Amino acid sequence: MNFFSDTYFPQLDNFKHNDIFQNIKEVWDPLKDLNKIILRILAEDNSGGPIESISGLRIDTNRLIKSIVVERWIKLKAPITSQALNIRIEGGTVLEPTAIIKGPAIIGENNEIRQGSYLRGNVLVGNNCVIGHCTEVKNSILMNHVEAGHFNYI
């Protein structure tokens, strides 16, 4: 890609959304436009089954910002998407009860979103990651194989 990305992100080629790191000056530059980046990615690929079709996922409309509440253990067999919520979750991901996901959010393949975790919007998660129980994540990019242990704030 370039010296900067090669130096700070040596495995960037394996990250599905590596284009967001092209032509950046500082490592945090993509975070400045993360909302727009996620919405662009979702607009380019809105494939996947509807989130509403998955038993055990409830769309919470009682809040000011709509979200998904996980009511039981779920392992997704295929991608799911909600254009209304601006959320996409890839197949192989495990969702545990009481997790809450607000959009915009993209969650890659084969992740574990553990009990009580709170993805609070503007979240881009790579593949094979773990969001530990009672961990809150917002305005963040988690590359592949990141493990955010329990009781964290990211």
Model regions and ranges:
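Terminal amphipathic alpha-helical/low-complexity segments used for targeting or macromolecular assembly
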Residues: 1-79, 83-85
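Structural signal for interior beta-strand "rungs" in well-ordered beta-sheet cores
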Residues: 59, 63-64, 69-154
